[in-house]
């Protein structure tokens, strides 16, 4: 007999707490192993520990020679060599390619979504227009097009420089929704903001508007209760929890999460950026000082890029669509001069990752200036080299990082790169009012990126962005 949803959710929370505690307990196992072998097997301690270190060394060499980001591989190698009992157990549980392959089979939608020939033809025409208008940027667009991410025109883009502005804008559009509301988020956190958002979503659902939500389970273990989930479902809101925290320890995935932040309303308006649905993003509570974030609102043809992303994920996760796919397409096309090209990334793209490759091309294409904001800066060798080359080449490169970090260890790693950047004429700033969570790139006042991608390995390789 299937358990009630509330009971399932509660059991996952308890199991997750126990499994997180396991990581700390493993350190005690390492200490206990050393103490016991020293005391009771002291005549054989050197042999036993030497054999263990030999296994650890072989494992470390295996990891080192695997493809992928060096910093990520080193992050596994260090604990395996220095605390081999803990390191080997953790790697067996959560390292390697097992979880990636399993998720590719179970939860990975095809990226990008398949589209009709007519859309591909319009994208090609838009590419010709871009080549004539801004020839210097056609290469970046052509790369994304080659990966199946289409170029749109007739799209109005509004930059929203504060989380509170974006969230209030979303809330207002939700209240006016007539056909459907789609939301896909890493975090939905209970609080003042969620009380208003939930009330608006439930009211629209009861009025016959199609409301669908995807949220990541791991991102909400402590922040979104079973009662809040049931309130949505009772009102007619359809909810899918992405990659639920599994009852088995080896399926507690810290990575391979849905890190996207997408809202689509009636197919005419879409939002994305760094802003999750939580009070700190609107500065309704104080966490790490002033919380600086940003996002973008799209209206017109480009909205379809985000709508299709949501629909594809929804369908792959087993959700049903009540209408034909074309029902969800935009019907208005405001005349604009600019171009818009939404793109996605996820672990199934490896080793070909559109996000990092696009960032590298944006950096390499800068002629006058390059401004970057990111909360987490843990670049690989390719990103570091590209930034240093741009700085040495006379480009005004500016990197903005948080003044008050939310994770001290991530900030410590970011600090380790700053010296080299400064040597290559890259200017590095700290957002002194508090925590900077905005993810953006602006190049030569001609091209910009706004989205959910951080400058770190997890965004480039492990998460859905």
Regions found by a protein language model. Name each.
Residues 187-192, 373-380:
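Short, glycine-rich nucleotide/cofactor-binding loops
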Residues 376-398, 402, 407-409:
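Helical hairpin unit composed of two closely spaced alpha helices linked by a short loop
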Residues 312, 386-390, 416:
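Short, solvent-exposed amphipathic alpha-helical segments in soluble enzyme
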Residues 382-384, 411-413, 443-446, 461:
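Histidine/acidic-residue-rich catalytic or RNA/ligand-binding cores of hydrolases
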Residues 1-357, 361, 365, 405, ...:
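N-terminal localization/anchoring segments of enzymes in phospholipid and broader phosphate metabolism
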Residues 428-432:
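Active-site donor-binding acidic/aromatic loop of nucleotide-activated sugar
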